[in-house]
Swiss-Prot record:
Annotated InterPro entries: LSM_dom_sf, MS_channel_1st, MS_channel_C, MSC_TM_helix, MscS_beta-dom_sf, MscS_channel_2nd, MscS_channel_C_sf, MscS_channel_CS
Keyword Membrane among record annotations: yes
Function noted in UniProt: Small-conductance mechanosensitive channel that opens in response to stretch forces in the membrane lipid bilayer. Exhibits a sixfold preference for cations over anions. Non-rectifying.
Name under which the protein is recorded: Small-conductance mechanosensitive channel MscMJ
Record-level GO BP terms: monoatomic ion transmembrane transport
Keyword tags: Cell membrane, Ion channel, Ion transport, Membrane, Transmembrane, Transmembrane helix, Transport
Membrane topology classification: Multi-pass membrane protein
Any one of the GO CC terms: plasma membrane
Length: 350
């Protein structure tokens, strides 16, 4: 056993190997204890917080145990100072990165088990649209912080690195200014709420149902099932008609009577229309029925009323019932509706 390798006896090298292998073995034991024994205890609790911690410490604790045993085993070896320094720095990096991994997993668990379910219970869509991108941002910042801390621990000057990142970030921001503008516009839309998911809107020549409000763009499904995607920045600068939030829908139509209709029957026609419209359960005021004009082939009655906004089918059914009732009453009263007609006069030659 007097044989030496790089100044270390075989016995010392064997001690290092045994300690390292012992660290791997104990690390696996700790892993099993965490996964089996502690999990059974934690599963009995009502809170999710301890489950989050359990899920977060699983891998880091194994890495830390193995690293500590490896680091301890090195003490039995004779190594140059620069090698020991490198190993010390490597251990620091491993510990910091393990802590970073724990932090990222912990943040992920807090969002998944607490914040996301909480926002699903709220009435505001802002929470639901912001929380998932926020989770990604927080995790990325945590990873960057861990990497910078690890670099700083081994002697790197992170000030110069941060300055370089600042210049790079500025260039990236300029390249992504449209994306950033759309992102901010998306946040403002969610805060201001000119419309919500499922609303019927008219904007920039598009009309349909809002299917998705994203961070970059909004998607509208038209009534012929075409999907239109509009950047949020354009939406923010446009006039938006929200047809869902109105409490009533306007009906404006013209009913033409034949020119040979007597005045009394014109008055009766107006009475019939107004009575039918006012008595229908789906209608709302104001109700307007007027003899408006002498048309090319008809005496035109202008009819205006409103229908409760309880869906498009409800609106169509109400108009259908009213129109059929008007036709039915006109037939009973002998009131004739006009259709395009022309009178042709023929002049005889002498």
């Amino acid at each position: 056993m007097n044989m030496e390798i790089f100044g270390n006896s075989i016995s010392n090298i064997l001690i290092f190997v045994v300690i390292t292998l012992l660290g791997i073995f104990i690390g696996k034991i700790v892993d099993k204890i965490v996964r089996n024994y502690l999990k059974k205890i934690i599963d009995k609790t009502k809170t999710k917080f301890d489950d989050i911690i359990l899920e977060s410490i699983d891998l880091p604790i194994i890495v830390l145990v193995v690293t500590l045993f490896f680091y301890f085993g090195l003490r039995f070896l004779i190594l140059p100072d620069y090698i020991l320094k490198l190993i010390d720095e490597a251990v620091k990096v491993v510990v910091i990165l393990s802590a970073t991994y724990f932090a990222v997993k912990f943040i992920d668990g807090i969002f998944e088990h607490y914040l996301i379910p909480l926002t699903e219970k709220t009435e505001t869509e802002l929470d639901e649209h912001i929380i998932k991108p926020l989770k990604k941002v927080v995790k990325i910042l945590t990873i960057l912080l861990g990497i910078l801390t690890a670099l700083s621990s081994v002697g790197y000057d992170i000030t110069a690195l941060l300055a370089g990142l600042g210049v790079g970030g500025l260039a990236l921001a300029l390249a992504m200014q449209d994306t950033i503008k759309n992102f901010i516009a998306g946040i403002l839309i969610l805060i201001d709420k000119p419309f919500s998911l499922g609303h019927w809107v008219k904007v920039k020549g598009a009309e349909g149902i809002v299917e998705e409000i994203g961070i970059r763009s909004t998607r509208i499904r038209t009534f012929d099932y075409t999907l239109i995607t509009i950047p949020n920045s354009e939406l923010l600068d446009s006039a938006i008609e929200n047809l869902t939030v109105r409490d009533r829908r306007r009906v404006l139509m013209t009913i033409g009577l034949t020119y040979n209709t007597p005045v009394e029957k014109i008055k009766r026609a107006k009475e019939i229309i107004k009575e039918i419209v006012e008595n229908h359960p789906a209608t709302l005021p104001p109700y307007r029925v007027h003899f408006r004009e002498y048309g090319d082939w008809s005496l035109n009655l202008r009819v205006e009323y409103f229908v409760r906004n309880m869906g498009f089918d409800y609106y169509l059914n109400a108009v259908d019932e009213i129109n059929l009732k008007i036709k039915e009453e006109f037939e009973k009263e002998g009131i004739e509706m006009a259709f395009p007609t022309y009178t042709v006069y023929l002049e005889k030659d002498n």
